[in-house]
Amino acid sequence: MDLRPIGIFDSGVGGLTVLKRLVEVLPGEDYIYFGDTKRVPYGDRSEEEIKKFAKQILNFMREQKVKAVVIACNTTCAVINKSEYDVVLFDVLKAGAESAALYTINKKIGVIATTRTVESKSYEKNIKIIDKNIEVYQKACPEFVPLIEKGLYNSPIAYETASKCLKELKEKDIDTLVLGCTHYPLMASVIEEIMGENVKIVDPAIKLAYDVKDYLLKKDLLNPQIRGKAEFFVSGDKDNFIKTAEMLLGEKIENVLHVDIEKY
């Protein structure tokens, strides 16, 4: 038994899609969520900047006395060295690669992600560790995150933008598409409509949530309470964050606190 909370962080609202899955699988846990809304998006930032941001956020999480941290940001997962940190870390990118390799039948997988994640080739590397015969086609969709952060994920402009970005992958005969950024599940209905029913859309957060549960069970670290709570911290704008959080989690969000993350 361990009553400490689980930490989750992302560049903005995207990680809320991961929090939603975690609450579904582990409703008794308490959660500390940090959204770096001041510095979003991460996708076009340098590797050095992202590493610095991750260090600051993990220092903040350590101060919150969390028992584990879920990195709900594929871009961060793609560039940091997890072994440098003395906290248990769960990697959304690794979970996505494992899920995609499991689902594909024709061994043709598409990955949409931020520019930085695509350039790192982290998905391709992780998928090919599992099965070197799988073909991986990656496409950067940098326009998605700004739209989602503004709450425009189901708008006509979202459909138009997604159609342009996905055109190349539609021509590759993929049967599996990884949403390689935790913001992208907010556009899942748009993406599914464009790709068609024959393409399996993979949300890495589903497997990730079960990975966390398996770890807590194995280490006897589960919180025994029936229903936990979530606390939210942001570095910048609260308004769109609260709106998206309430829509995703289906409840009123009042405890969103501002934190000066750069002091960490």
From Swiss-Prot:
The keyword Isomerase applies. One of its GO terms (biological process) is cell wall organization. Substrate binds at D10, S11, Y42, G43, N74, T75, T182, H183. Pathway: Cell wall biogenesis; peptidoglycan biosynthesis. One of its GO terms (molecular function) is glutamate racemase activity. PROSITE patterns: ASP_GLU_RACEMASE_2. It is an enzyme of class 5 (isomerase). Keywords: Cell shape, Cell wall biogenesis/degradation, Isomerase, Peptidoglycan synthesis. The active site is at C73 (proton donor/acceptor), C181 (proton donor/acceptor). It catalyses: L-glutamate = D-glutamate. Its EC number is 5.1.1.3. The keyword Endoplasmic reticulum does not apply. Belongs to the aspartate/glutamate racemases family. Provides the (R)-glutamate required for cell wall biosynthesis. HAMAP family: Glu_racemase (MF_00258). This is Glutamate racemase. The gene is murI.
